[in-house]
Amino acid sequence: MWVSWAPGLWLLGLWATFGHGANTGAQCPPSQQEGLKLEHSSSLPANVTGFNLIHRLSLMKTSAIKKIRNPKGPLILRLGAAPVTQPTRRVFPRGLPEEFALVLTLLLKKHTHQKTWYLFQVTDANGYPQISLEVNSQERSLELRAQGQDGDFVSCIFPVPQLFDLRWHKLMLSVAGRVASVHVDCSSASSQPLGPRRPMRPVGHVFLGLDAEQGKPVSFDLQQVHIYCDPELVLEEGCCEILPAGCPPETSKARRDTQSNELIEINPQSEGKVYTRCFCLEEPQNSEVDAQLTGRISQKAERGAKVHQETAADECPPCVHGARDSNVTLAPSGPKGGKGERGLPGPPGSKGEKGARGNDCVRISPDAPLQCAEGPKGEKGESGALGPSGLPGSTGEKGQKGEKGDGGIKGVPGKPGRDGRPGEICVIGPKGQKGDPGFVGPEGLAGEPGPPGLPGPPGIGLPGTPGDPGGPPGPKGDKGSSGIPGKEGPGGKPGKPGVKGEKGDPCEVCPTLPEGFQNFVGLPGKPGPKGEPGDPVPARGDPGIQGIKGEKGEPCLSCSSVVGAQHLVSSTGASGDVGSPGFGLPGLPGRAGVPGLKGEKGNFGEAGPAGSPGPPGPVGPAGIKGAKGEPCEPCPALSNLQDGDVRVVALPGPSGEKGEPGPPGFGLPGKQGKAGERGLKGQKGDAGNPGDPGTPGTTGRPGLSGEPGVQGPAGPKGEKGDGCTACPSLQGTVTDMAGRPGQPGPKGEQGPEGVGRPGKPGQPGLPGVQGPPGLKGVQGEPGPPGRGVQGPQGEPGAPGLPGIQGLPGPRGPPGPTGEKGAQGSPGVKGATGPVGPPGASVSGPPGRDGQQGQTGLRGTPGEKGPRGEKGEPGECSCPSQGDLIFSGMPGAPGLWMGSSWQPGPQGPPGIPGPPGPPGVPGLQGVPGNNGLPGQPGLTAELGSLPIEQHLLKSICGDCVQGQRAHPGYLVEKGEKGDQGIPGVPGLDNCAQCFLSLERPRAEEARGDNSEGDPGCVGSPGLPGPPGLPGQRGEEGPPGMRGSPGPPGPIGPPGFPGAVGSPGLPGLQGERGLTGLTGDKGEPGPPGQPGYPGATGPPGLPGIKGERGYTGSAGEKGEPGPPGSEGLPGPPGPAGPRGERGPQGNSGEKGDQGFQGQPGFPGPPGPPGFPGKVGSPGPPGPQAEKGSEGIRGPSGLPGSPGPPGPPGIQGPAGLDGLDGKDGKPGLRGDPGPAGPPGLMGPPGFKGKTGHPGLPGPKGDCGKPGPPGSTGRPGAEGEPGAMGPQGRPGPPGHVGPPGPPGQPGPAGISAVGLKGDRGATGERGLAGLPGQPGPPGHPGPPGEPGTDGAAGKEGPPGKQGFYGPPGPKGDPGAAGQKGQAGEKGRAGMPGGPGKSGSMGPVGPPGPAGERGHPGAPGPSGSPGLPGVPGSMGDMVNYDEIKRFIRQEIIKMFDERMAYYTSRMQFPMEMAAAPGRPGPPGKDGAPGRPGAPGSPGLPGQIGREGRQGLPGVRGLPGTKGEKGDIGIGIAGENGLPGPPGPQGPPGYGKMGATGPMGQQGIPGIPGPPGPMGQPGKAGHCNPSDCFGAMPMEQQYPPMKTMKGPFG
């Protein structure tokens, strides 16, 4: 008996070894952290590891799990109300070790006995089990399954019938190496080998109690579930809660398991000595056996030293066997043996004795578990580890669309969708009203310039912001050679166009701009040297004749690293085809030619020198567009600007003469500016005249998805775009910018016309993002003088005396408004002062127009000019670090319109305009009281500006110098304006100039959303006419005095004033009476720049000015009505792949969605456990034919498909393989004897036919052999007396009878027949007599019962064909006969006549599967169907089966068709076609005369099964036919390609990579020269228009908007 326990005890000795603990320590948490303890002890050793699944599966925190109090034991958890599942990564963060023990204390319920369910399961990421413990309730067993190393599953089954007795049990599963064991109630149930497994990875989910078929939770009670990472700890786990009587507190589990064996364990003492384990056996044994076993076990006991630290006695306690010998001794320990191999688990031990009952436990009934009183409440446990995530909640609402996943492996084709509904026919409605303006779209590419439009009528309204600048000046031509000066004459007629010049050299390479200058439009060229003044010309010349189209320019060198100029707007013409954007920086202005002298009119002499330029003539017609230049090459990058370089601000040079318009350049796109604060919304003005058409905007964002239209056929593939050579990337890092999309590729060729009706219009697209505000545009040209009515001439007022400037006093309260003083008389005009020193580098405004000279005489038309010389290479002006000059962005169109002539109500404060010309100087006011001390100035703002004082001086110097004012027009006096905003604390004069000019522009650039998206650049507006002179407001309260500024530049000498004695400052007087209007005074000296006045009323419409520069982006307008459906936008760049978010709760079930497109198939998962066979789904519609695939291996033959519809009768087929014997067809009516036809080619081998109807009665055959004697038939009625038979043979002589009495002698030899005598006694049977001759046949008797089958007789000889008998009634269908032997093939007959086309036969049964034919050509795509409704899960096997059947059917039909059309030999050319189907039965005809027997016809197609015929007479068996002569044919070749199939359903391919950037387009030709503008006014913003905003306002961290 001890031998059966030796392996178990040996395993017990191994439990102390944790050699794999080093490996599992990283995977398994310590037992203290998990709250694990062995049942019979209060704690585990420190290095025991495992998982408490009650905590990790959050069973205590799940409200759906019922908790039942259990006195003297843990809580009972009733599972089944909610699924118990958690992600594997939360339960086993590093996976499950290869060796482990799963321990559960559970009670199975009655209703679980009919199920198969998973007690424990860990799935992988695809939902396939990694490891599972399955309960098979039908077989009362457990099955452990795990993924094997080869991908298949390894499993082992344990019979555990005791689990199903509806009682509590302790189930322990240990997996150690390749052995798995199950223990139930601390007794070993069985051990099974387990194949090599894959390691369990921390992916997928962990389930507890899951129905394998329905996926629902299974109901059972649970007390304990945990996993030890040491499989041998199951031997230490006790069963006190299951077997209360057999669990004394001091005994270990091992002792309980072997109670009958009285196992005693001696643990090592603290000194580390290893003691043996003692064994007390039931039967007395020899001490030698004990010693041997003890020695063996002691070799294993050293492993216990690693765990146990308790002490025990040095010797074994006495054994308690009564019958044991007293001489059993313990041998000393032998030497330590080597480590043995792991043994197999031992056999199950005997059941232990019932343990002692607990003190407080009571069993209510024999079947009930023990109920124990509740013990004292334990101390609060340590905080548990982070529990796993809870169960999935109810289905949440549909989440947002996830990011696009990686493309999966190509899956099997999906079911084709159903045909879509026909699209609705849409009637185009009437044109709707014009909607409010939508959001400004992004800048489109520049089209070719259109011809200049006619000047429109002057509009009414406030002046708009300056429009876009024209193209930068192109290079001027070389100076012409000087001729002899001609005489001055009047302007000649235009000469003929010159000869086309030669192709110019390519422009130089442009360096890329460093970071920080990416927000600005193309750089203007450096100013050219001022040309020499020309002589005054009295009259303008006529416009020149249009020039000849120039040659194609040589390629410009591209700057591909310069990002596409999205903000540049060229001159707007009619929209041309979209070209790819060109790159290039504007060229420098050319040098002016030397002016020639205008000669008098003389004879035609030699060509004189070129005259100095006269005033420009009217614009000639636009020249022919030149050929497209070649693209530029990449540019070298500029060196990076250092941080300190931002202080270098290049001031613009003196203005050169206006060069000829150059081609429009493209600047760099700016960085995304922060949105400015939102300005006050102004009142809506009347609509202005339509402006010039803007350049086409780029495509907006895609609109909301409209209903799907019918898909057009795929267009041809576009040509591959040209690659772009990339430039070095921009220096520095660009922050807060997403990657820019690539340039749009060239427009593809027009695809073929789509088939089908157009779909419904889609919903409008989302509004585009607002672009960054542009820089303020350059000052527009002044409008013409207003048309106000001139007031009466005022009387000249007396000049006031200038007072001495007083010291600044404290600011007093504002005094009462004084009355307006009397108008002073005009002073005497002073003498002109000397010329002042030259101004700073900022160019002054143009002077007023000089007086018009007298008109000169008209010159004669000039000759056709000589062919021009080859132009110089174009220059790409690439400014150096110190010469950065920037022009402003185009302004938005003005929107305000005032009512004509009448001043409107005062609107909200508009954008401060540039200072107007100084008005007529007012009277000298009385000095005010001293103001309060000013607040500290904006030293922080100005201090941080990287502007040197000399720069400010040079920038602002000309702004404070006045100029001659244009005479203003008096209007009615306006009402007093509101009190102005308190002035900014004063700065020095130049800083005040700087701030007063730039702050409104900076604030104007601010919007409400400082962090908003950039708006799109608006289309340029036309410059509006100048406004009417505003009414003069009453004088506002004096502002606070600022700190003194630095001395300004020296102004020009003023007019000498009247000499007066300086008076003391007087007090403010009472307001005087209104004086009469004085005469117009002479212009006074230039005053200081005043504060910006209130917005005046709208001015009169001015003459249409030149197109200005692009202004800054306007405020965001009210959202316009939805526009018409836009074209689909280009795909945006793919965003970065986001991190996987946490698992959300399950949402509620959503509405039925539309059928999505087939997703990318995922990677093939491992095979799951076999599922139930699903019901076959309905076959989908016929799929489109896919592209030719690789020939796959021959598949297994599929089940025969349904018969197809009858096909068109094809021509005769080729010689096919020998067909199977067909079934006899129905007997047809006897036809007329046909001519003998030639032997046709053998048809396809048919299937065995049903038995035919009985044929006509044949000739009598030879008598067959006698059959075996049948059973006696039933006794028949006595038949009629037959005729007397022939006398039989005499019988044997009977015994002599008694002698009769002699009768009387007769007359003749024979007397009459006497009466019948009485029947004599039966005599003995006589011997058989000789056979008599056969009698006449008697009448047929009643048919007897069937006799037994006779033996098979020899075959009879072949009889002759009899004449065909009359058509018999159809007999009942006979039973299916056995297939006869194959007959020999007949000799080939001669060719028969070609028969007429027979009717279409009924569909035959599917033939055997032939070899696959070559794939046919792809068909043209059919109309796409409307997306089908969401179907069930696709059954791919069903689809494959259906497709296979259809292909086989099509193949058979086509094979027959094509083989019939192939070339035959001459003798086979007229083979009969396949037999047609039987016709309908006609009216019975008269019996025809028997025809001559025809040749055997072809075997007919399989007929329908006839009704059973009347049972025929048994025929004689015919002789066996001769063996056929034919040779079995080989398999035919594959048929020709089938017809073009319907279009297949392909899967949507993955998104292709983004195309390469297209080649930049060439710049457009220069627009026509505009009319010269009038002289402008001094605008301080001109001082800064050329400065980048980053240099004007360096970023500060504490400021928003453009300042930070």
Curated annotation (Swiss-Prot):
Residues 301-509, 604-917, 1001-1429, 1468-1517 are annotated as: Disordered. Its main location: secreted. InterPro entries: Collagen (IPR008160), Collagen_superfamily (IPR050149), ConA-like_dom_sf (IPR013320), TSPN-like_N (IPR048287). Residues 573-631 are annotated as: Triple-helical region 7 (COL7) with 1 imperfection. Residues 724-738 are annotated as: Nonhelical region 6 (NC6). Residues 989-1011 are annotated as: Nonhelical region 3 (NC3). Residues 383-397, 686-702, 766-781, 792-808, 826-846, 1271-1284, 1369-1378, 1420-1429 have a biased composition (Low complexity). It is found in: Secreted, Extracellular space, Extracellular matrix. This is Collagen alpha-1(XVI) chain. The gene is COL16A1.
